[in-house]
């Protein structure tokens, strides 16, 4: 969902991109190539000439799951996708020469949180920081608006429109953001990173 939005923005900019996916991507930009992979075999993945990695994998959850109500199996599945897969991909990208990484995490992420979702996000952030990329962008958005395929998210979108204006000060970080807007922010950072790298190498 969010990854597709970022691909759209990057496509407009014409930035060469390699998109990793489980299945073929609809409306893939002409500047992008896709690589269909088995996420259970990331150790066998071979990629080259990567400059910047964007990570936005996330196990599909419902609101009550994010709030902490998860079965043991769901916790294991979440950890596998949100932590293990993403960390393995980050390490592969680093080996392939990636200088920068952009990670979509979550507001309130904390490796010491009692909330499994937020703890998992925080643990991944800590591990990514240890990989020593030259440029690390970690985004911690609140609720992401715009996923029209999920009725529960559409409901949350509507609630956000009324609640967001009342979130001031320390609460402002919990405001929702449209996936399209976040994608534009992420892509702008990628452009800035690319331009900075070109200047260093010129």
Put a short name on every predicted segment.
Residues 192-202:
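Single conserved hydrophobic/aromatic residue that forms the stacking wall/gate
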Residues 1-11:
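N-terminal Rossmann NAD(P)H-binding glycine-rich loop of SDR-like oxidoreductase domains
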Residues 13, 111-194:
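Oxidoreductase cofactor-interface core, primarily capturing Rossmann-like NAD(P)-dependent enzymes
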Residues 5-6, 29, 64-66, 112-114, ...:
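Short glycine-/acidic-enriched loop or helix-start segments at secondary-structure transitions
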Residues 1, 67-119, 130, 137-139:
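Conserved Rossmann-fold NAD(P)-dependent oxidoreductase catalytic core, especially the SDR/UDP-sugar
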Residues 32-88, 92-95:
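NAD(P)H-binding glycine-rich loop region in Rossmannoid oxidoreductase-like domains
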């Amino acid at each position: 969902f969010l990854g597709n939005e970022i691909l759209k923005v990057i496509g407009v900019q014409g930035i060469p991109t390699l998109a990793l996916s489980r299945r073929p991507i609809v409306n893939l930009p002409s500047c992008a190539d896709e690589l269909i992979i088995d996420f259970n075999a990331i150790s066998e993945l071979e990629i080259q000439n990567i400059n910047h990695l964007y990570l936005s994998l996330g196990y599909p959850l419902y609101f009550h799951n994010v709030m902490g109500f998860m079965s043991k199996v769901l916790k294991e599945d979440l950890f596998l996708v949100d932590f293990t897969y993403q960390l393995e991909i980050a390490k592969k990208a680093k080996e392939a020469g990636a200088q920068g990484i952009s990670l979509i995490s979550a507001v309130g992420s904390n490796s010491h949180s009692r909330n499994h979702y937020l703890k998992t996000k925080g643990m991944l952030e800590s591990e990514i920081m240890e990989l020593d990329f030259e440029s690390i962008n970690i985004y911690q958005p609140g609720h992401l608006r715009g996923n029209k395929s999920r009725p529960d998210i559409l409901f949350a979108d509507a609630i956000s429109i009324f609640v967001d204006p009342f979130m001031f000060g320390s609460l402002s970080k919990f405001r929702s953001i449209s996936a399209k807007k976040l994608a534009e922010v992420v892509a702008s950072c990628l452009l800035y990173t690319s331009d900075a790298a070109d200047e260093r190498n010129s």
